[in-house]
Swiss-Prot record:
Transmembrane segments: 10-30, 42-62, 75-95, 110-130, 147-167, 169-189
Gene Ontology annotations for the cellular component aspect, listed alphabetically: plasma membrane
Lineage: Bacteria, Pseudomonadati, Pseudomonadota, Gammaproteobacteria, Pseudomonadales
Protein encoded by which gene: msrQ
Protein name: Protein-methionine-sulfoxide reductase heme-binding subunit MsrQ
Protein species of origin: Pseudomonas putida (strain GB-1)
Location of this chain's protein in the cell: Cell inner membrane
Length: 203
């Protein structure tokens, strides 16, 4: 296994936040509605992990270090794990496992549908995030995994629909997402290694 300590660090970070939030909930530190706080934090955690995952390719091109790419799949699976926990928190703490209430929730809060579409996209990416799928799909695998940008867009829309008026935090996530999208433009992506070489010569 390459870069085991880097992988371990990501695993620890991925586990640490939910564990800390559970501790806060157990100690009654999350206010009068800890279930909602947990749900919101898990959703933001998933969006953060998604943006970090999308940073890996630009970082590899800028630094030439292959470790960024090695952990990309692991980070992507953490995105999926946080989203699953986010959904479970919603079902248990908000919906109370009252399935009859779900239709009412979907009518009142259509952003849930947007979030569900994002989850389905992540599910496809998680299922095909393995070497077997890469071999089976061939060149189509890369095209399929561009779906991650649609997932990012749906996640940002879901977040925007929830916050509505206070856009300060949302704007930070959206700006980072926009920068990452610009870095995907072929002309820009091809220029990243040249930037890295120029920096190396300057040093």
């Amino acid at each position: 296994m390459r870069y085991p300590w880097f992988r371990l660090a990501i695993f620890v970070v991925g586990c640490l936040f939910p564990a800390w939030w559970l501790y806060e909930a157990a100690m009654s530190l999350l206010g009068p509605d800890p279930g909602k706080i947990m749900m919101d934090r898990l959703g933001l955690g998933a969006l953060t992990f998604l943006l970090v995952t999308l940073c890996m390719t630009p970082l590899q091109k800028l630094t030439g270090w292959s470790g960024w790419i090695v952990v990309r799949r692991q980070l992507g699976l953490w995105v999926f794990a946080y989203i699953v926990l986010h959904i479970l928190a919603y079902l248990f703490f908000i919906l109370g496992l009252d399935w009859g209430q779900l239709a009412v929730e979907l009518r009142k809060r259509p952003y849930i549908i947007v979030g569900a579409l994002g989850f389905l996209g992540l599910l496809v990416l998680a299922i095909t995030s393995n070497r077997y799928s890469q071999r089976r799909l061939g060149a189509r695998w890369k095209k399929l995994h561009r779906l991650v940008y649609a997932v990012l867009g749906l996640g940002l829309l879901h977040f925007l629909w929830i916050v509505r008026s206070d856009l300060r935090e949302w704007s930070i996530y959206a700006l980072i997402g926009a920068v990452l999208m610009v870095l995907r433009i072929p002309a820009v992506a091809r220029g990243l290694p040249r930037v890295a070489r120029a920096r190396g010569r300057a040093v």
